[in-house]
């Protein structure tokens, strides 16, 4: 089995791409895109019985499920590793582990959210509360987001941390990390031949597992990584072509 565990946004799919093939719609409007070549190759890979794709995303299950190729996948990691889905159902074993090992901290997140709503002076467009796992602030532009993060990062404690991602600032428990969910799935289901991709701080630890492939614009680095030459949506195509090449070399089935 060839296993590909990857972040979605800014790794495989990209927003505001007029020349791309749309793979996600909301209320009739296109949201995210891939190059036509990337879409065609990836959809063929997904048809193969010995190719396993596991999304590993900050998105909620409902947000991720809007994407065309997120259909009938056996495993999915959502909410920055706070949720593991097996055959579309929330994995209760993982939820117990999450609490027992204190990967989540609902009380600290709630307290910080309340402080933001009462005292934070930099205006934000919206505050999105992801269950009791984490919350994020969306700002008008990247400059305002940076200004907010520059202030909020001083509030980092042993319980929470703030991270800047474009126009968004995330407040996340220090124990919540995608890598924990990835390791759980690998151990629980004996996954082999692991390849990982991502672009941001949230992807750093889990992309140390297996063979690492990163887009050129990624903010993370690894000693043994493969990094694309292209950036943006073209980087997504290059990543998928590299995955196809690795799949062909390590599996007996041949794409036609």
PLM regions: where:
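Mg2+-dependent phosphoryl-transfer enzymes with acidic/Ser/Thr/Gly-rich catalytic loops
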Residues: 172, 179-256
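Hydrophobic "anchor" residues on beta-strands that sit immediately upstream
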Residues: 3-5, 75, 195
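Short, well-ordered alpha-helical microsegments
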Residues: 61-65, 145, 178-179, 203-205
